[in-house]
Amino acid sequence: MYQDSGCSSSSSRRGSSSAAAATSTAATAAETAAAAAATTTSSSDEETLETLTIITTTITDSDIHATTTTTTVIASGTATTAAAAATTATLATLATLASNSDIEDSSPVESEDSEECEYIEIDCQTTAQEGTSPSGGSSSSGNAVLLQRSSNNLQQQQQQQQQQQQHLQLQLQQADERLLRKIGYIASRVRCLSKYYGDFRLVNPYSARRQRRQLQEILLRHSIFDPGKEHQRAIVLAAATAAIAGPLAAIDCVCGSSSISLEAVSSRSRSSELEDDHHEQDQVQEEQEQEQHQGDTEDNEEEQEHPSEKPERTDIEEEPPPAIAVTTTTTATVRRKSSSSSTISGTATVSGSVSVSASASQSFCSNNINLLEELLIQFYEEQDHRSNLTVIRHHHHQQHQQHQQQQRITNNNNNNNNCNSIQNNNNMSNPAATAAATATPSVEQPATSGTTNIHLQPTSLPDGSDNPRRRRASDCSAVQAALQNQLHCITLKNNNCGKAMPFHRGSCGAAGEHLLAANSIANRATIILSKSCSNVDGDATATAATALSSTVGGGIGGIGGSIKMRASATDIETNALNGARDAIVASNNGNNGNNGNNGNNEYSILQLNNTIIQCHFNDDDFRALVKDLKRKVEYTERMNWLCLSKRPLGPPHRKSSLPKHQEVKRRFLEICDTTFSEEVRAALRLPAFDSYEWSDADVIHLMQTMFVELGFIEKFSIPVDTLREWLYEVYKHYNEVPFHNFRHCFCVAQMMYAITRQANLLSRLGDLECLILLVSCICHDLDHPGYNNIYQINARTELALRYNDISPLENHHCSIAFRLLEHPECNIFKNFSRDTFNNIREGIIRCILATDMARHNEILTQFMEITPIFDYSNRAHINLLCMILIKVADISNEARPMDVAEPWLDRLLQEFFAQSAAEKSEGLPVTPFMDPDKVSKPGSQVRFIGLVLLPLFEALGELVPELTELIIIPVRIALEYYRRLNDAQTKTRKSVADSNTSATSDSNSGTIDSNAAMVSTPGGASDKLSLDKGQGNSQGSGGGGGGGGGGGAGGGTGSGCGSNAAGSVSPQMPRSGSGISVKSRRSIPSQKSASRTSVDEPGGMASELHDLPEGSESGDSETATEVDVAEKTSKFKVDTEGSSNRSKSSHSTSRKSSREKRPSMIGELCSSGGGQRIRNSYGNIHGYHSNRCHFGNNRAVSLDQYSSAGNNRRLSDGLPQVISDSNVFYGRHNRSSTETTVAVGNPQDTNANTNHPVGCQLKELLARTEADSDGEGDGNGREDKKIPLVIPSMPQLATSSNGNISPTLVVTEQILPSNGSTRSSASSGRGGSGVPGGSGGSGMPGPSAGSGSSWKSRLRQFSDYFSFSFDKSNKRFGSTRSSPCPGSNSSSGRTNNNANGLGENQDGLGAGGGIKPGMCCTTITNSSGSTVKGETRGGTAGAGGGALTTMTTGNDAHQRHRAYSLDVPGMMRYSSNDSSRHPSNNTLQSAGGGAGLTTGLEVTAQRVPPSLSVEMGLASGSSSEAGPKI
């Protein structure tokens, strides 16, 4: 029960005093409290919404006992008249009742009692203590005299108040009704909130039923003017229907003479406290009655009451001398309606000084309360809930009166408050001693040990002035218990409110609940302004409450700033008690003149707002609370979801609070001067160091140790304090995401530190470079959101827009790093010269930007080129080495022991999967290597380590052999470990693939062996055509040359020509064959990541990767590495510079740059458009330039460009052309583009891929195709001229030996986003196997039209085989999965479907049958020549008679709509066609074959009927390699 802060019987005051008094008067006080509680309870129930009654009374006796006690008290009042006794009893009773009512509110009976008494309810528990003796036995006699006077005064006042109440009855009734309705509305909203939040622990004591009952009580109370009856009814209800006449009479008496009661109370001695409690109860009852009357009359007779208050104040002032002799602490809680009673209780409160304290406290409290109410306003105004505590009613006049009283009593109040606040704890513990102490500072101060129940209603000051302030929120927060009387401010963090709230009663009622709700929603860590937000009722009672609150909270600004809220509830209680006395006096005075404002809720609210503003800026504590509360609200997603806050949601990764940071800083500063042991420092130099064994503060300290150990602090005069502040700020600016958090930053820095020590980089590079490296490592992921650049670019986030899709995160990290350094206290480089700082800045930016994995191949290629001639005196070489070093440190987890590295892998996958989920939910292209449905931990690790990490480490090891044992060998061990795991999975997948090729083709694992992949047989019916490496004329050809081509070309191995030795491999390497052509293998980087522009090492670094598990090839979207996808993603964007001939070797426009040198990667420029950017259906700029120009080797390492050191290197750069990427990213968009009609031009590419008019001889095309397949194909990827093609029925084309050449259908530019990997299986097989029908690469009998599904599955198979694992998008769709191309049936839809299913033209493309002009063979050939309206650039499909082998030149690769996946752009590295070199082998030169689109049919972008089988004519081999010949 809120008896702690509330007034227990005077004897039950907080602290020892309360204990002692309680002990002495336990029974009596209990009874008194019960009676008072009963009375108060009924009023509280009614006023619950309006005021919060805080019951400090510990007595839980029934109201009947309280009544009896009250009667007894009256009788026992020493030397007190019956009236005085009644007054005293009333006060005690009121206090008790208030506490009891609060306590009892939970019970129906209590609620009833409180209903009646709430308005009247003022608990004035006075502890009469002599200043000298703890016990007021001697002072009780003095109290008797005072009580007599008080009784007389109270009687007179009561009569006046009754008259006033009669005048104001109607007005009050209406005001109450409005108030309750508003409160009910608020409460209903609160209940609604509680429904949404399971953790919303708002205990709403004001149920709808109770609110209705309260309303009825209000009506009844106003209809019945006899306060005695009302009080009696309340008591009866509280006491379980036990009627008590004595308390009622006492209440009447009290109402009659509230001032006398105050005097009597003040004169009471502690010995009489027990009796006083009873008397107080009686008085409280009387006061409550008077308050009711006054509440009725307050509005109209407010001014009148002021005069009465003045006399009362005079009486009180007169009383002070007795009060001096006997110190009595009385807490009066007055309900709005019971303003008169509150006034009475205030008057009854001991002395003028007390009254002053009360009034001062009240005014102060009201200000505080206003502030608290402001919280509600803030919450609900923002919520568009404009209730704004309208429930709060201030009686401005009463407050004014109270304020005046407070002013008059200010000095005393200040003293009382100070003493009380100081002595509250003591008083609570030792009421008598406290009373004495209090009395000493202020004779008039009653012993504050007594506890009182005060409602948080603003009450008029004794002087009649309005309460200038409401209770401070700080007061509430600081002292929960004490504030319970006032505000029942409870911190929800402890969920205390749950217990307390049921007992809260206040006129604000639901408004208090509002605050509770807001608090609770704000994580229950803020103050709970329980019901009484300094009730708007301007009642004297409210004033008393306000006085108490002000006393508790501290002196009112004007009254006494000295009065400060004590953290202890005891202090608050003591102050509250003193304030209560003053408040009682003030309330008596206020009741006389302040009733006028009673019904003016709007005015009260306005006043409240003004007060809030004033207090808000004057109360630091409250401001802090408000700020904290607002922060919690603003950062609470649920609050935002409810529109409770207009602040947009912050990133989910953002930290919402800093308490942890502060604690970490505190801990760090405590240990920062210590030194780690030698063992720790030695361990810090090893990769096995595990940061998760250390706390955050320790980790920061370890970072400091790195600077110390490397000597940077001394060498560069870095201030230690600045370094520490900088490290702490860096810590703060890392987000709590699974992987890219502060611990990751430490791991990278620690690995750099270990490498620096191991390789002696200080001597190799110099101190400054090492400093740059260490700082770069620490800052390299600052403020990382947990979503990588791929997401940023695809989602067009603020960072992507800000940095134009160019390494958005890395640029952001740099920006944050230097923003931190802008702060002098964090600028560790402050002592450097400007030139040196500029060099440092340049170096840090270079290093951080190098961590963008999209630049991996570019950087690695360049580094490998300079390694043989590395010169430590060459600035460019040093810069490149620094970039390699930070890249190694950044991805060095696998160099750590498995027990350290494995958890980091799990965290990384957690972050990846979260991003994948976000991409799916937002409709963005799903990054293949992050899709939990497509990747497995072993496979992902094998690909990453084998294709990305190990080559990088080994490249560094060649220059710095000291690192071989430190990091390279552990990485090899890790690779072997994951490879074994992956092999088992791969075998399983293969078996599954064999059983269901088409299904496996879609599967991410790439389990399908090229053998398993079945090219649709010429008989379209057969979905599968197992390709034997040697089958068909083409070595790779399976059932069709195309099949071979598919197997070989697509696989890259066993290219259709068989020229690729790997051709034989293709069957075994489902993905590897398709994903990594032997050619591509020749370049490790390319092999490493099919999608990533493989760095094509001049040599055959690829050889290292030949071993990769078959499933590990990066060709599939699932198998694409982060580098591949990142390159593709960024390259569209980065290539915004155009496919400008960045790479010297190849101009995107002229694919001439020898493809041979660089296997066509997705990176190869697909620019059929010569660097034109294709706009996605989204219209994104991402629209991946078909021409993504490769960044020339000579090009500086720009963020955009990945210049490769050679044309072949450009390969890796070639990725730049993520041609299909546009599709890749926005497959959907691409779809639309695919849908667009494309005038297919006959690309006049030398590549067989180039479609020629039907007039072209197939032989020519075949020859070209073969040449291209051989890699001879135009090394210069010529762009096919875009020629609108009309495809005459081309049955004859089907005859062409190459199925690929098979008459090209007009490609609706629905070019299936053929992965570059999608080399049209049609790639012309040398022996154009079965050119007729299935001949050639198509592997599909041209004419046979299989069911659309069969040809679709074939396309899938082909795409899987041919699509390089990079064809993420294809993969995504299953590489064969239909690429997003909507229109294309199967193959057309899928770029991946390399013309699979071409053989099937359901439309009746019979072999040799004329192709329906309407049909478009969407071939994805990259042939740039073909113009794609939409995105598809040129693939023209040669529809063979019957065998529609698709051959689109490479341009189409862009058109692949694979775009859903971020996977490698449609072009496989190997498919030069993807790279926009149509000629590239990728295009399967089949275009050269019948591919020459027969002009004549104008292709309209239309979805190819499923019957159309499109053959992707993508040469499997990278252009650099001879494409497999069909």
UniProtKB/Swiss-Prot annotation:
Low complexity composition bias: residue spans: 1-43, 324-348, 401-440, 993-1005, 1139-1148, 1314-1324, 1341-1350, 1375-1397
Gene3D superfamilies per record: 3'5'-cyclic nucleotide phosphodiesterase, catalytic domain (1.10.1300.10)
Q: Which CDD domains match?
A: HDc
The name this protein carries in UniProt is: High affinity cGMP-specific 3',5'-cyclic phosphodiesterase 9A
Which keywords fit this entry according to its UniProt record?
cGMP, Hydrolase, Magnesium, Metal-binding, Zinc
Q: State whether keyword Metal-binding applies.
A: yes
What is the name of the gene encoding this protein? Pde9
**Composition bias, Gly residues:** 1033-1057, 1325-1340
Q: What is the lineage of its organism?
A: Eukaryota, Metazoa, Ecdysozoa, Arthropoda, Hexapoda
Tell me where on the tree of life, at the top rank, the source sits.
Eukaryota
Q: Which Pfam families match?
A: PDEase_I
